[in-house]
């Protein structure tokens, strides 16, 4: 049975690498629209960008693209920034070198140390591309070099939980009343889903179709339903490895119950029911990721003696 220290570290490596990648993707699209779309109010738009990442009560002097870059891209002390998330992933990897290949460690080092410490708006796209490319490389090496054992499962669960959380935050900040093609395309692009959506929904881009695709599609690897299904499968495997898949009443362990309820809530409801109180639904999805994380901590990372 795996040491809880390794399980915990692998889980957070998965989360932090995914966070760096998703933050770079969302900011790349959002900040480009602010700098290139003249009608947009940069102050309100920057406040909206902060809101995606849960940053509220932002001082007026921070409502500029430059300050967004400083706080959400290059601040290594902030684990929610691109550089900070990579730094946190590297620190977790340092403690479990025995569970990672040399290639993964070197790639994560390169990603962390190579992130620029200062990014100007005129050069931000290069920084975002660097982060996305390096995260893709780290994930590719993890996928190609890791045995599908417990370490892999914890890494995978962390990655997928972060993906669901970031998707929910992004969708929560989206104005559903803006049904323009431009706004919907920006949403899909920020979720790396535009091309996949076009291949699946031939014809005009519609906001209802985009929400449906991002939440409910069963084969798109960035949809909420797909990620939750994969998390459930991984948690089932982990439970079996630890001999506690179900108790005598047929009840799954707490993390699986939380995921199962969330998945059923998506699968067995009409889209109109979900979008009726959309902000609250996305808030609930974020609470699910937090509850599963706490459950994993209690069950695997910091179990009671």
Where on the chain are the PLM-derived regions?
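Alpha-helical transmembrane segments and their helix-helix packing motifs
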Residues: 1-305
């Amino acid at each position: 049975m795996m040491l809880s220290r390794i399980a915990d570290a692998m889980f957070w490596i998965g989360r932090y690498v995914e966070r760096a990648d998703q933050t770079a993707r969302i900011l790349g699209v959002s900040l480009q629209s602010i700098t290139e779309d003249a009608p947009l109010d940069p102050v309100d738009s920057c406040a909206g960008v902060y809101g995606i990442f849960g940053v509220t009560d932002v001082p007026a002097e921070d409502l500029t693209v430059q300050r967004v870059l400083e706080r959400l891209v290059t601040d290594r002390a902030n684990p929610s920034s691109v550089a900070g998330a990579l730094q946190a992933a590297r620190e977790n990897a340092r403690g479990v070198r025995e569970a990672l290949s040399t290639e993964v460690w070197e790639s994560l080092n390169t990603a962390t140390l190579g992130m620029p410490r200062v990014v100007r708006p005129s050069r931000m796209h290069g920084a975002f591309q660097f982060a996305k490319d390096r995260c893709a490389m780290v994930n590719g090496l993890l996928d190609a070099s890791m045995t599908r054992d417990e370490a892999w499962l914890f890494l995978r669960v962390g990655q997928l939980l972060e993906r669901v959380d970031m998707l929910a935050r992004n969708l929560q900040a989206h104005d559903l009343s803006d049904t323009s093609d431009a706004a919907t395309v920006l949403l899909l692009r920020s979720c790396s889903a535009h091309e996949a959506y076009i291949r699946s929904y031939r014809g005009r881009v519609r906001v209802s179709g985009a929400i449906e695709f991002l939440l409910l599609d069963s084969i798109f690897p960035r949809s909420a339903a797909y990620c939750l299904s994969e998390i459930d499968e991984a948690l089932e495997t982990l439970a079996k490895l630890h001999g506690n898949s179900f108790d005598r009443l047929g009840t799954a362990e707490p993390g699986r119950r939380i995921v199962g309820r969330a998945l059923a809530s998506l699968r067995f409801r009409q889209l109109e029911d979900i979008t009726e109180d959309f902000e609250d639904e996305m808030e609930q999805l974020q609470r699910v990721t937090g509850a599963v994380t706490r459950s994993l901590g209690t069950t695997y990372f910091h179990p009671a003696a």
